[in-house]
């Protein structure tokens, strides 16, 4: 696996859980002997939904809700087979979406 890299993209609604997961991944990769760059914070997506408070009238009374999706990027350069095995065994919280590209 020389001159290869693993790119891991993490997404979550809660940034604290996301940062904990990123630290776990970085720590595991460094322990197995790989070079790690990251976690790199990517721009946060913000989805805003506007809803009328009243059912029939009062259009001026509105409520806004937002959903923020936080993202991080981790690059693992020159991973060893031990690194890949350790990452596969790693348990992360259910609120974190993980996308891995080899």
Curated annotation (Swiss-Prot):
<dbReference type="GO" id="GO:1990904">
    <property type="term" value="C:ribonucleoprotein complex"/>
</dbReference>
<dbReference type="GO" id="GO:0005840">
    <property type="term" value="C:ribosome"/>
</dbReference>
<comment type="similarity">
    <text>Belongs to the universal ribosomal protein uS10 family.</text>
</comment>
<keyword id="KW-0687">Ribonucleoprotein</keyword>
<comment type="subunit">
    <text>Part of the 30S ribosomal subunit.</text>
</comment>
<dbReference type="InterPro" id="IPR036838">
    <property type="entry name" value="Ribosomal_uS10_dom_sf"/>
</dbReference>
<dbReference type="InterPro" id="IPR027486">
    <property type="entry name" value="Ribosomal_uS10_dom"/>
</dbReference>
<dbReference type="GO" id="GO:0006412">
    <property type="term" value="P:translation"/>
</dbReference>
<dbReference type="GO" id="GO:0000049">
    <property type="term" value="F:tRNA binding"/>
</dbReference>
<keyword id="KW-0689">Ribosomal protein</keyword>
<comment type="function">
    <text>Involved in the binding of tRNA to the ribosomes.</text>
</comment>
<protein>
    <recommendedName>
        <fullName>Small ribosomal subunit protein uS10</fullName>
    </recommendedName>
</protein>
<dbReference type="InterPro" id="IPR018268">
    <property type="entry name" value="Ribosomal_uS10_CS"/>
</dbReference>
<dbReference type="InterPro" id="IPR001848">
    <property type="entry name" value="Ribosomal_uS10"/>
</dbReference>
<dbReference type="Pfam" id="PF00338">
    <property type="entry name" value="Ribosomal_S10"/>
</dbReference>
<dbReference type="GO" id="GO:0003735">
    <property type="term" value="F:structural constituent of ribosome"/>
</dbReference>
